């Protein structure tokens, strides 16, 4: 599917399109005149005015770009309606541009639908590079540095043990239990709120906001992303369905921002608030009579929401991929369980203190990050000034994508790339310091590297080791009792996830089943 097929054309009128096209042509003419004669990186030539509008893929874009790279190389350049795009498909180009020239390649492209109409301008990941971004990044780092993240380990362990008990009671609902699991960790860390159900209103609010983001965040999904002037069209006009959708999604976004933060404000006034990111930020606010109180409170609210939402969708998808992988690669599961049994024994469940003694499980987490690659093109970068690289001109405002999936499935670096092999990162039974580091691509690069990567890594480890200690995961059975072979497939656009699948999740022994239940009971009594 290309970008034209994916556009929401509901009720768009001829006048709207004509006006937008005229504006686009004017901008195109100005930019084209300024950059005429420049040597761009190789790529599809495109058509006059519209460029590669009909060639730019939406579905499986990472696969299409990998095919294009066979023709054009590790830098692919094209334009859509005058907007330049650059696809990077090698470690060398990503390092040279995003890391070594990060002052130029660290901004974000304009996203009229998501940012300007739906109100996602508060979130750190979508902010353009600048002083505001640097300030919020520093504030966010206070709560997501390796040292800060270590303070959340008890929350993570307790959440994992509760998740394991939910799997014991209703393993067929593991996807629902995953939603509750990650939502409960994020809600507890961000707001100090204990979430007990996947139908908790706080989680439903956040999921409503995220569903709008996932639909509208696809580049070019709506005409307004191609022609920003359309954002000024009144929402009551025929053809302005995108404005009405944006308004509905913006309301959901506002609710997910305001409701939990207001709860913490009220709890602090009563003196009963739990420790959390939002509680810390609120306690640091100036007096109510201070002239900048409102501004500071908004910043605290935004940082709290960013903490809650940071990576929740991608980590959820990665853990789904964990179950998907274990059901397909039983030999990996058995090796990991043998290591856990040797270190942890059968009298308790694993903790973070066991991590240094579990090299195979650590390698498994690395391979999970590579094999799942839930964000194959990451969040797009944008150049803030003209640049030249290897004799090629890269104009200001170019949208830059990194095809991490292509690199992480390169058979030269990762032989048999679609197999799940933790051994890639081991040497003589210990972690190999010279092995590839898939996390360096999966969590982004340069100054826009994911600030929540340490919490994500620890959560993935604790989830994986807990599930492997407690359960055997295997494919579902057909009517004759034979295992159904799972296909290694992915679905999605911005993020990828396994297609809807079933697997058997069974406690490894009656004793382990009892231990999981008793541990969860002791937590619920706290």
Curated annotation (Swiss-Prot):
GO terms for cellular component: membrane. It is found in: Membrane. Heme binds at residue 450. InterPro entries: Cyt_P450, Cyt_P450_CS, Cyt_P450_E_grp-I, Cyt_P450_sf, Cytochrome_P450_fung. Pfam families: p450. One of its GO terms (molecular function) is monooxygenase activity. The keyword Protease does not apply. Keywords: Glycoprotein, Heme, Iron, Membrane, Metal-binding, Monooxygenase, Oxidoreductase, Transmembrane, Transmembrane helix. It is a single-pass membrane protein. Its main location: membrane. It is an enzyme of class 1 (oxidoreductase). The chain crosses the membrane at residues 12-31. Cytochrome P450 monooxygenase; part of the gene cluster that mediates the biosynthesis of alpha-cuprenene and oxidized derivatives. The alpha-cuprenene synthase COP6 is the only sesquiterpene synthase identified in C.cinereus that appears to be part of a biosynthetic gene cluster and is highly specific since it catalyzes the cyclization of (2E,6E)-farnesyl diphosphate into only one product, alpha-cuprenene. PANTHER family: P450, PUTATIVE (EUROFUNG)-RELATED, P450, PUTATIVE (EUROFUNG)-RELATED-RELATED. This is Cytochrome P450 monooxygenase COX2. The lineage of its organism: Eukaryota, Fungi, Dikarya, Basidiomycota, Agaricomycotina.
